[in-house]
Each structure stands twice: as C-alpha cells, then as structure tokens.
C-alpha cells in the first residue's frame, strides 16, 4: 500500500535537492515489496534470482508456519549469510512488522552493513518482538551481530539513532486521542508505556509532574512545536466525530452520507478520504455494503483488499477502502475508522490498542469513528472523554507494564553527550588555533605515556 506514496516522496525530495531532476527508479533506486514474485519485484524474490536460488512459493512456505520467516531463514542458510551484494544501502520502512530473519536477509545483500530501518513500536500490530541490533543480526554465521555502540565509536559524527520529535501527519487532537487509546492511559489498567521522562521528551512531550521510571502519578502534555500541523480554531471540534449505530445497515448509511457530505459540501477530493475497517472478520461485508451505497451516490471506490490488487493506496477520483495493514504508512485528510465495536471486548489487548493507534493516526485532519450496537463504543468514548476532561493531558498512575523499546533511548543520550563534546572540541580548536587532528594526536600520545607510567 505504501509503494506509490514512497515513490512520490522520494521524487519530491530528489527534485528539490537536484534542481528538478527525476530519480532513476530503473537503475539507481528500487522500491519493492518484501516478498515479491514473477509479476511484482520484491526483496526476497530478486535476491534469490541474483544468487541462483529458486524462490520458494507461498504455497510451499505456508506449510512451515510463518511463511515469510521461513523463506528468509532458508535464504540466509543457502547463502550462509554472505550473499551477492546487490545494494549500496537498504532502507526498511514499517520495520516493526518484520521478523529478524528479514533483517538478516537484507544485511546479507547490502554492502558494509549499510541498513537503515524505520519503525514505530506502537504500530506493531503483529506482536513482532523488536530486539536490539546485536540480537537482531546475530546468528550461527555471525554470533556478534551489529553493535551500534562500537559503530558509534568508529563514526563519532554519524548518528545511529534518530528520534522524530515532531509529528507532521496529524493535528494534535487526533494524535493525543490515538496515543491515549494506544497506551490505555485512561483504561482501568495501563496497557503499555514509555520507560522514563526522557523517552517521552524525545517524542515531543513534556512531563509536567512525576517520574515515569517509578510507580507514581504522572502528568504529561504535548509540546505545541512538536505538532506543527494546525487547523482553524473554529473547526477543531469537527476534527473527530463519533457514531454509535443501532444496527449494521445504519452504520453503513451514516458512513456513506458523511463521505458524500465531505465531497459535495466540504469539497474534499474522493482520494482525500480513506475508510479503514477495525473489524477484520467482517471487513468484506463492510466494504461490500459501502461500495453499493457509494456507487448509488456516484462515488467511486478503490478497495485495496480486492483479490486483483497489486500496489498503491490511492487512485484519483476514488475513496480508498483498506485494512489496517494496508493503510500503514499512508495517510488521508479524512479517515473513517469503522467497525470499532470490536474494541470493547479486547480493550486490554496490546495488539488491539496498537491497531487503534495505527488506524487513527492515518487521519491528518478529520477522523470519523463508528460501530454497531447500543453503547458499542462505551469504553472508547469513556477514555476519550477522560482525555478531554483532563484538558488533553495524560494524567495517570504509572505502573509496571509493557515498556516500549528503550535501547535507542540510551544510544540517543550517548550520542547527544558525544556530539556536545565534539562541538566543544571544535570550539576549543578554533580558539586555540590547533586542529582537531592535532588535539587527538596529543591525546593519544599522552595516553600512551600515562600507560607506560602505570606499568
């Protein structure tokens, strides 16, 4: 689902940096699915072809449990973790969805361990265990893996971890609702949390009160600068709208009418609207019924769940209908998250919470939430109302729970300290008229002399 969007973003950035030149997607930059096949290029399929290995079909792979994990492990074994180097760099997006076997496959086909992976653990909807690089890249062919601390020493000016403090995708209100529900801030028990105050601060929040490393009350708010996307104050209340339908048919009727209004009255383009179904079991019935209603209103739809779907999330003149997985990484001005009644019985599930977070954060400006049944969104509404009553701050008792990945936090802090020292060193170099190289030579020589004295 991300294919076209990534192509668009790369092209836009490349043109800006090169005064209008178009990137060479045939020979220089490859944007691919992870698996691939004869009709659609993919990392695994292309790697097999490049290394003289017969690609394993899905039909065969699924006999062994986790099909994708199986084929990646087989590739690593077949090449003994040392395949032909096909790429100068490999960038993995939505990396939280991939098993470590895929990371190892990518490492085996790239030069000099030049791998960049981007992830958001709160969007981990498959319960994949995110490990540190040592464990992720270590196997029987290389027990050491990749040690980012050691790599940092080799390249002191290069940052191994970059934490994105700002969120340009969503207006602040939608982001805060998504985080509150994703973490279970106002649930009767906290579902997941960040390890300490700095972890929150790194992500654009301010801990107003409390210590997030302890079991105590904490109050957290969002920095204004960390959410630069703003909407007119008169339309803030319209950002999020919720509908509890008496029955399934009326839920579909409401969604269709809201989409029609958005296009005819608010003048949104159909491709500015996406519908994401939280109820995966009934997604076919939802989309089938919605397609019929929208067709009656002369509104075209693009169902990325169709069997004939190949790639892309948007189609000009069409409203997108999508699963949560296909929507990951994409966005739309207005997003309908439907079938939300399934949340009620799974409110204590971390995977369900992550799905809600992922679905809600696809919306840039307008979020529409619906479900079927009397008081079907009771828990969700309760938590959202609690957030509103607390003036969109997180006010909760921090308790032991699932901690989101914290390794990068320590590495990020190490980098900040090292970068600050390096800048001080540069400043001293300028003031004293001594080059940095000369300072390092003097330091090395002095260290050797001190070691001799100690002996």
Task: Describe the residue ranges of each PLM region.
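Conserved helicase NTPase motor core
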Residues: 30-34, 38-39, 43-135, 166, ...
């Amino acid at each position: 689902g991300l294919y076209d969007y990534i192509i668009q973003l790369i092209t836009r950035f490349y043109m800006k940096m090169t005064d209008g030149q178009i990137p060479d997607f045939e020979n220089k930059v490859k944007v691919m699915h992870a698996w691939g096949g004869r009709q659609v290029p993919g990392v695994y399929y292309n790697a097999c072809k490049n290394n003289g290995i017969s690609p394993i079909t899905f039909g065969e792979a699924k006999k062994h449990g986790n099909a994708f994990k199986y084929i990646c492990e087989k590739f690593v074994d077949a090449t003994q973790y040392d395949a032909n180097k096909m790429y100068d760099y490999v960038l993995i997006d939505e990396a939280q969805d991939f098993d470590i076997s895929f990371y190892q496959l990518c490492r085996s086909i790239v030069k000099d361990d030049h791998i960049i992976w981007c992830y958001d653990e709160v969007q981990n909807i498959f319960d994949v265990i995110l490990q540190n690089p040592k464990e992720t890249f270590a196997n029987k062919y290389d027990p050491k893996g990749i040690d980012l601390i050691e790599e940092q020493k080799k390249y002191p000016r290069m940052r191994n971890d970059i934490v994105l403090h700002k969120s340009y995708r969503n207006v602040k209100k939608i982001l805060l609702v998504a985080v509150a529900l994703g973490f279970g801030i106002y649930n009767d028990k906290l579902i997941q949390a960040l390890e300490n105050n700095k972890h929150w601060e790194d992500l654009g929040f301010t801990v107003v009160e409390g210590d997030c490393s302890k079991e105590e009350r904490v109050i957290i708010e969002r920095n204004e600068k960390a959410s630069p996307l703003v909407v007119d104050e008169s339309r803030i209340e319209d950002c999020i709208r919720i509908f509890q339908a008496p029955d399934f048919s009326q839920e579909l009727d409401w969604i269709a009418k809201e989409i029609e209004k958005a296009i005819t009255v608010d003048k949104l383009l159909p491709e500015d609207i996406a519908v994401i179904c939280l109820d995966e079991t009934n997604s076919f019935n939802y989309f089938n019924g919605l397609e019929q209603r929208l067709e009656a209103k002369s509104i075209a739809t693009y169902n990325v769940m169709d069997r004939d779907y190949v790639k892309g999330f948007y189609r000009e003149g069409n409203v997108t209908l999508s699963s949560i997985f296909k929507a990951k990484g994409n966005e739309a001005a207005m997003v309908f998250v439907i079938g939300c009644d399934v949340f009620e019985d799974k409110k204590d599930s971390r995977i369900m919470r992550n799905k809600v977070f992922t679905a809600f954060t696809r919306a840039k400006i307008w979020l529409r939430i619906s479900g079927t049944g009397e008081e079907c969104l009771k828990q969700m509404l309760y938590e959202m109302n609690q957030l509103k009553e607390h003036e969109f701050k997180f006010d909760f008792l921090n308790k032991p729970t699932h901690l989101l990945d914290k390794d990068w936090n320590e590495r990020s802090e190490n980098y900040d300290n090292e970068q600050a020292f390096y800048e001080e060193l540069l400043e001293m170099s300028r003031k004293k008229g001594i080059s940095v190289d000369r300072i390092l030579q003097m330091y090395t020589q002095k260290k050797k002399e001190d070691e001799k004295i100690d002996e």
